[in-house]
Swiss-Prot record:
Positions annotated as zinc finger (RING-type): 746-798
Residue ranges of every copy of the Helicase C-terminal domain listed in the record: 866-1032
Enzyme class per UniProt: hydrolase
Localization terms from the record: Nucleus
GO biological process, one term: negative regulation of proteasomal ubiquitin-dependent protein catabolic process
Record-given protein name: Uncharacterized ATP-dependent helicase C23E6.02
SMART domains the record matches: DEXDc (SM00487), HELICc (SM00490), RING (SM00184)
Domain (Helicase ATP-binding) ranges: 403-588
UniProt family annotation: Belongs to the SNF2/RAD54 helicase family.
Domain of life, source organism: Eukaryota
InterPro entries per record: Helicase_ATP-bd, Helicase_C-like, P-loop_NTPase, SNF2-like_sf, SNF2/RAD54-like_C, SNF2_N, SNF2_RAD54_helicase_TF, Znf_C3HC4_RING-type
Pfam family, one: zf-C3HC4
């Protein structure tokens, strides 16, 4: 436990130290009741009461902020890195508050110069720096401290040369005091020349305790220098005494009621402590305050100087940004300061900017209650031209779609649960609202490549011939049109996210050539960005969840009248991913990242007092998103009435040898995790940590999974020579790019994975399953068109893929001289793990010449605890329900392959469905599974089977290993539990005790509870990228 004594002695308690109104001599009696004995006017007394109320709230807030920091430090080490990390964390929670936690220097180690070193001997603790409370403060210009050796006093003196001696002394006093707001010492101008280095304390107006001014200045300079080091500034703009200064006028804020939203017309300032709770407009900061309502707003506030830093969190990027570029918590401009939303505090234009945002918010929340029509008597029927009859919830959805297109939003997000007919509702909209102009008539539909043909079939089968649009598919070898006019001659154009990403990349290259006045090597038309679309529809819109990808940036750049997102899971990896959809839809003001992150991303990621920002977020969702689940009721009845679904968790213990192997792996992983924690390098080693977690999860299934591919490798000289030759063919710029990647994210499915394959020579990478899918899809196309020249292409740059020139990321690290995926001194390197294998599993090493074939060879095959558990469950189902079919899901294809041996031995007929099969093979497997009564089991990989399949012929689901995101599992289960299912569905989750799997399930439960309770019925499917606490929990290093 950390000793916080040094920190606690800096506790701010200005109630006892600051008179409330120095001008009017109004203060408090000893029992803290107002003293009305003075001759102050009633207005002044009213102001005194209000100031006292606000001061008490402010003090309570600061105490909570300090207590929060103590709580962060409670279970932490006392190292400088840990302290800095916790300081950044706490400061980041309150970006609009002008108090700040800062490092407190050890005065014995300080010298009077500005060159304070950032090391443990200099900084020993932390301190809370806060402005004076309850006093009107003058608007004093900030001081710039030059680090070339000029002293603070010389700097101040140089700015007061033109003033009289008394004016200069007074200004020196004010400026010096303004620099360090939290201490009890105030610098005053001494009456005697020999006493000018003394100060008096303000614990009492009559006390004159002497404190050495030099020590105080050293402390101030140490704090400022630490900020300068964080910013890498040659000089530091000092914190000024800026903040709201209230006049005698007092008024309640005007506000408008829009349902339960209060839109306060207020000006956000550096310190707006009238809105600590954070309700009302997006301007309001979050707080730990217990206050529920904010009734009072002061007008006519005064602002500080241009050169100020809002101390609302340390910068994540230590480099100075370019002018006008936004940062995470803080925005820095060369000539002036802007607040977190980008409003210029010292510009006369400020009010206009806020008025514009107020109008944008009013437009966003306009007519919320009228958007959904629940009255069946006024609900429109199936539109002419649509073949299927719409279900009632689809009719309701169509009216919502039409209403949003007719509003200022001109689009939104249809987020109905899987199987509720998002596609048919979108087609109904196309039929109902055709374009009025022939020049702008084309609807662009962007979809994953696997759904292209499905969309085409839906259009042909769902829209009547009398209304049927002309359709063009722009993908692969079928891309016959190169200019915008050709595309715009069709009613509907179907394409993929990869095509948009590729064209956006070309656009960036073209724009750069124009900017640099460089010769253009090859002119290419950019038809998607040159066209003016009537409507753009993103199917599986979560594909653009990462706002920085080429696909996301390209989609946002498309020009269209109407814009729609279709997605059953609009968020999967954090609130910030929802921003990408909002940006595409151009929903103001939140299409601006600074506004979105300030109002939602930062406060919702803090997990502290998220009630107010969550309410605002739900308001945003209600304004632009429609979501119904299978259990949603319409006209008093559920949308769908399905057979019951029963989920059972089957817990099992690993065998003693399996558990010994697992514990050894976990111990090594914990050592590595602690090392990254101590170094503060969790983010940069995120990929390595995923590998460690992957190995723990694999060990719960079967020890072979960990060393399977390594054991299958012929690690002789010829193998090394061949792969090094492949490595040498990677473009040099690609090698440099690969060395800098921090997160192993597949460029096609966007999942963060532990195993990537690098395409040579372009250096782009895919996960093994996606790469296999790209190759097999190309082979399918070649067969369908009888064109043997069709070859697979990279999904990023569309360079041809040579299947003989693929390199694993692990080998790339070896050949490029990078460190192994874990450190060389760690026991978790592959060769060491192989030595740790229990004896009964070591035959995979002894028979490495068999490669992956050993997984399906009965002579060498070895079972595991989890295989036996699943096998017994399958046999029990077959015995009791001889006609039922079973789906078995796993994230690991090689684990599914291990089941083929016992199934053959037991005479259980099965089929496989993985990304490694061609499209034709997968389709045939589904047909055979449905029509052949003898086929009882379908072994299916989680990635291949969680979208786009109808498997209602099965009513038993076995999940072999839990996934981080519970909603991915639920999507897989819904392959069986959907329209067409006529039997009860039984789900069996096999979990090993005392392993990472228990912690994954606990993490799932916490996430599900948080999301479903916060975002309503079933909620949106948001699972955060694993943070440090979650990683520690998964490695078994913390209890929660």
């Amino acid at each position: 436990m950390r000793n916080n004594t040094a920190f606690e002695q800096f506790t701010l308690n200005p109630c006892e130290q600051i008179p409330l109104d120095d001008k009017h001599n109004i203060g408090f009696n000893k029992n803290n009741t107002p003293d009305y004995s003075s001759s102050a006017s009633s207005d002044q007394l009213l102001k005194n009461d209000i100031n006292r109320h606000e001061m008490e709230r402010r003090i309570a807030f600061l105490n909570r902020k300090q207590a929060l920091f103590n709580a962060f430090m409670h279970d932490s080490s006392s190292s400088l890195n840990t302290m800095e990390s916790n300081i950044e964390k706490v400061n980041g929670l309150f970006p609009n508050d002008n108090s700040v936690i800062a490092l407190k220097p050890n005065e014995e180690k300080l010298n009077s110069s500005l060159s304070v070193e950032n090391n443990d001997s200099t900084y020993t603790d932390a301190t809370l720096i806060a402005p004076k409370i309850g006093l009107d403060r003058p608007n004093i210009n900030a001081i710039t401290i030059d680090v070339d050796g000029h002293s603070l006093q010389n700097e101040i003196s140089s700015s007061t040369d033109k003033l009289s001696p008394s004016q200069s002394d007074a200004l020196f006093e004010q400026k010096q005091d303004s620099l360090f707001w939290n201490d009890n010492a105030v610098i005053v101008v001494s009456d005697s020349e020999s006493d000018d280095n003394n100060v008096r304390t303000k614990s009492s107006l009559n006390d004159h305790d002497k404190v050495n001014m030099k020590e105080k200045r050293n402390l101030e300079l140490a704090f400022m220098n630490s900020k300068r080091k964080k910013l890498e500034l040659p000089s530091l703009p000092v914190l000024s005494t800026a903040g709201p200064s209230y006049t005698n006028s007092l008024a309640l804020p005007p506000f408008h009621h829009h349902n339960n939203y209060k839109m306060f017309n207020t000006t956000h300032t550096l310190e707006d402590d009238k809105f600590l709770q954070g309700k009302g407009t997006s301007n309001n900061p979050i707080s730990l305050s217990d206050e529920e309502d904010n009734e009072i707003n002061f007008q006519n506030k005064r602002y500080g100087s241009d050169s100020v830093i809002l101390p609302g969190g340390l910068l994540h990027d230590s480099k100075l940004p370019e002018p006008g570029k936004h940062l995470f918590h803080l925005q820095w401009y060369h000539d002036r300061f802007h607040n977190i939303e980008g409003f210029n505090l010292s510009d006369s234009n400020n009010q206009k900017v806020q008025d514009d945002q107020q109008q944008q918010l009013e437009e966003l929340f306009k007519d919320l209650d009228e958007q959904l029509v629940n009255d069946p008597t006024i609900r429109e029927g199936t539109p002419a031209g649509l073949i299927p009859t719409l279900m009632e919830h689809q009719k309701e959805g169509l009216m919502w779609l039409k209403r949003l297109e007719e509003s200022s939003k001109k689009g939104g997000i249809l987020a109905d649960d899987m199987g509720l007919g998002k596609t048919v509702q979108a087609l109904a909209l196309l039929v109902t609202r055709p374009p009025e102009s022939k020049s702008v008539k084309t609807t662009l539909i962007i979809t994953p490549v696997s759904l292209l043909q499905q969309w085409h079939n839906e259009i042909l089968t769902k829209i009547a011939p009398s209304h049927r649009p002309t359709v063009y598919i722009h993908h692969g070898s079928s891309k016959k049109h190169k200019i915008a006019e050709q595309l715009m001659s069709y009613d509907i154009v179907l394409t993929t996210y990869n095509v948009i990403a590729y064209e956006f990349k070309n656009k960036m290259a073209y724009d750069k050539s124009i900017e640099d006045n460089a010769p253009i090597k090859k002119f290419e038309h950019l038809p998607f960005f040159e066209a003016e679309w009537y409507r753009v529809i993103l199917d599986e819109a979560q594909t653009i969840k990462n706002r920085n990808t080429l696909a996301a940036r390209g989609c946002c750049l498309l020009e269209s009248t109407y814009r729609w997102c279709l997605s059953g899971t609009p968020m999967q990896n954090g609130v910030e991913e929802f921003y990408s959809l909002i940006k595409f839809l151009r929903i103001k003001p939140y299409s601006d990242w600074s506004s979105f992150s300030k109002d939602f991303t930062i406060p919702l990621s803090s997990n502290i007092n998220t009630s107010a920002p969550m309410k605002r977020f739900r308001g945003l969702l209600k304004a632009v998103l429609l979501r119904r689940t299978k259990n949603t009721k319409i006209d008093g009845k559920p949308i769908l009435t399905l057979p019951p679904k029963t989920a059972v968790k089957s817990e099992t213990d690993l065998s003693s040898s399996e558990m010994e192997f697992y514990n050894t792996l976990q111990s090594g992983a914990q050592i590595q995790m602690r090392k990254y924690l101590q170094e503060g390098t969790i983010t940069t080693h995120y990929g390595s940590l995923l590998v460690l977690l992957l190995r723990l999860r694999q060990a719960c299934c079967h020890p072979w999974l960990i060393v399977a591919r390594e054991a299958a490798v012929d690690d002789n000289d010829s193998f090394q020579a061949k792969n090094r030759a492949i490595y040498n063919q990677i473009y040099p710029e690609a090698v440099n790019r690969l060395k800098l990647i921090e997160t192993l994210q597949c460029s096609l499915c966007m999942d963060v994975v532990a195993e990537l394959l690098i395409i040579v020579p372009c250096g782009h990478f895919l996960c093994r399953e996606c790469l296999t899918h790209v190759i097999t899809s190309s082979e399918d196309m070649a067969k369908q068109t009888s064109n043997e020249n069709i070859s697979p292409k990279c999904s990023v740059c569309e360079e041809y893929i040579d299947t003989e020139r693929l390199l694993s990321y692990a080998l790339f690290r070896r050949y490029s001289g990078m460190a192994p995926i874990v450190d060389a001194d760690n026991k978790l390197r592959t060769e060491n793990i192989s030595e740790l294998l229990p004896k009964q599993y070591s035959n995979i090493l002894e028979n490495r010449q068999m490669g992956m074939k050993i997984f399906t060879d009965p002579k060498h095959w070895t079972t595991s605890t989890k295989i036996e558990k699943a096998l017994n469950a399958v046999k029990e189902i077959i015995k009791k329900q001889p006609t039922d079919k079973i789906l078995i899901f796993s994230q690991f294809v090689s684990f599914l392959e291990l089941f083929t041996v016992p199934f053959r031995q037991e005479g259980i007929k099965y089929l496989m469905y993985t990304g490694g099969l061609s499209t034709a093979e997968r389709n045939q497997a589904l047909i055979n599974f449905e029509v052949d009564p003898n086929v009882r089991v379908l072994l299916i990989s989680l990635k291949a089977g969680n979208v786009g399949l109808n498997l209602t012929c099965a009513n038993h689901v076995i999940i072999l290993d839990p996934f981080w995101n519970p909603y991915i599992e639920e999507q897989a289960v819904d392959r069986a539990h959907r329209i067409g299912q006529d039997k009860p569905v039984n789900i069996l989750r096999i979990v090993t005790n005392n392993t990472i799997e228990e912690r994954v399930l606990a993490l799932q439960d916490r996430k599900r509870e948080l999301i479903d309770s916060a975002l309503g019925e079933k909620g949106l499917r948001e699972i955060s990228r694993l943070n440090t606490k979650e990683l520690s929990f998964l490695f078994g290093m913390s209890s929660r």
